[in-house]
Regions:
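Glycine-rich phosphate/pyrophosphate-handling loop used in enzymes and phosphotransfer proteins
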Residues: 1-190, 195-233
Length: 233
């Protein structure tokens, strides 16, 4: 993905570059940022949708979760560029794929959207929280206030992607802390990827323990090997 990123930063940018197929395209799409990068019509129409674009069953502290796209090789490339190659414009681009949210009239029930926080050490290293950047765009679209101060990460955890499933559970246990009570609040928790769900569950447990009435989770993509029952909402 780094080689592709170098190509995007160099050369003539009179035509935009599709961040998924990495090809130079004519302006055939509304999914375009600053006239330079975007998602071409073909890639957008062929994004791997999941059954989890509808609300699916949550966990002990999560009422339901939504994950509209599969975490495919191309989606992984774009998210990694956003995370590690300082391609912050991709956050707006990814959030621009939010038309799938329009099918549901549940969003005005939430008091806050809360992005999963980074530990301050990792935030200093990276310079930004990619989930927060995407959540900001989604929050503006859904007209839900975003709170980045309600939940903090107190434990410098290892990267979940580097751990086996059993290690991921203990890695994020007691890793988050609420900065204030949230009695009776309905909170939409946002993260970029749903893998095992341990990070979201750890966040939700802390929010619930501090009085949140309901926590739901929204992620951009999900590993398709995750099997969860679909629920009607």
């Amino acid at each position: 993905y780094r080689t592709a990123n170098v190509r995007r930063k160099s050369g003539n940018m009179s035509k935009y570059i599709c961040v998924f197929c990495d090809e130079r395209k004519e302006s055939d799409t509304a999914h375009l940022i600053n006239g330079k990068i975007g998602i071409c019509r073909h890639c957008f129409e062929n994004l791997d949708k999941t059954a989890y674009a509808s609300p699916y069953q949550g966990t002990e502290h999560i009422a339901f979760t939504m994950s509209p796209f599969e975490y495919t090789k191309s989606m992984r490339k774009v998210i990694l560029d956003l995370k590690f190659s300082n391609c912050k414009a991709y956050a707006k681009l990814l959030a621009d794929m939010k038309n799938y949210l329009d099918s549901y009239d549940i969003w005005d029930t939430f008091d806050y959207i809360v992005p999963v926080p980074l530990h301050k050490k990792r935030l200093r290293e990276r310079g930004y929280n990619q989930s927060e950047l995407i959540a900001k765009e989604v929050a503006e679209y859904l007209k839900i206030p975003m709170r980045t101060d309600l939940l903090i990460r107190t434990k410098a955890t290892k990267k979940q992607s580097s751990l086996v499933r059993t290690e991921r559970v203990t890695n994020v246990q007691s890793a988050f802390k609420c900065t204030e009570k949230c009695d009776g609040k309905k909170i939409l928790l946002f993260d970029d990827i749903y893998t095992t769900g341990n990070t979201a569950q750890s966040c939700a447990r802390e929010l619930a323990n501090n009085g949140a009435e309901q926590i739901c989770a929204l992620t951009l993509a999900i590993h398709v090997q995750i099997k969860l029952p679909i629920i009607a909402y």
